[in-house]
Amino acid sequence: VPANWPRSRSEHFKTLLKARAIETECYVLGINCVGVHDDTYYSGDTMAINPFGEVIKCVSNIQDLLVVNISNDVAEYREKLNTNKDRRPDLYKKFLY
């Protein structure tokens, strides 16, 4: 997720990234600006988050390269949580038109 969040909203950026990871059950990478541009301060907060919303690695206040290892445990987690069984395609048609 490329971003341009100022330092004053850093916590919003981090919270939204964690929420995206949890709701999609996917790894999420958030890449944010760092430094100063036009009198606006950016804290970076570039981070990798696992599908449980846990921060794997984060880089703040410096320009850096983030390298992370990810596991394939997500497939096993998705099987256990199987939200697809809750789908109701029979109801979708009445909401499409």
Locate each region found by the language model.
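Active-site beta-loop-alpha substructure in enzyme catalytic cores
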Residues: 1-24, 28-30
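C-terminal beta-strand edge segments of enzyme domains
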Residues: 33-97
